[in-house]
Amino acid sequence: MPLRVTVLYCGAUGYKPKYERLRAELEKRFPGALEMRGQGTQEVTGWFEVTVGSRLVHSKKNGDGFVDTDAKLQRIVAAIQAALP
């Protein structure tokens, strides 16, 4: 059963391409192992929240910014590796 990774992003802010880049990178690293779900908000929220399983692992709202550095990506990758059987 694939591991669910959910990204809640600000649709009104135009963050969908950022979600698409993250999704492509994670699917390349974990082929067939993830169920990626992206949800854009209707209103301006500024959100870019990444949840692995039921655990929030990256939050722009809480100060993490975008997934724009290798260190931020590695934190998400590590959370996925820890959650996979």
From Swiss-Prot:
SUPFAM superfamilies: Thioredoxin-like
GO MF entries: antioxidant activity
Tissue: Expressed ubiquitously with predominant expression in the pituitary, spinal cord, sciatic nerve, cerebral cortex, cerebral nuclei, thalamus, cerebellum, muscle, cartilage, trachea, gizzard and artery. Weakly expressed in pancreas, testis, ovary, kidney and veins.
First-listed, main subcellular location of the protein, grouped into a coarse class: cytoplasm
GO biological process entries: response to selenium ion
Domain of life, per lineage: Eukaryota
Entry annotated with the keyword Cytoplasm: yes
Pfam families: Rdx
Chain residue numbers at which the record places covalent cross-link Cysteinyl-selenocysteine (Cys-Sec): C10-U13
Keywords of this entry: Antioxidant, Cytoplasm, Redox-active center, Selenocysteine
InterPro entries: Selenoprotein_Rdx-typ (IPR011893), SelW_related (IPR051441), Thioredoxin-like_sf (IPR036249)
Localization in the cell: Cytoplasm
GO cellular component assignments: cytosol
Induction comment: Up-regulated by dietary selenium in cerebral tissue.
Function summary: Plays a role as a glutathione (GSH)-dependent antioxidant. May be involved in a redox-related process. May play a role in the myopathies of selenium deficiency.
Family: Belongs to the SelWTH family. Selenoprotein W subfamily.
Name under which the protein is recorded: Selenoprotein W
Taxonomic placement: Eukaryota, Metazoa, Chordata, Craniata, Vertebrata
Primary gene name: SELENOW
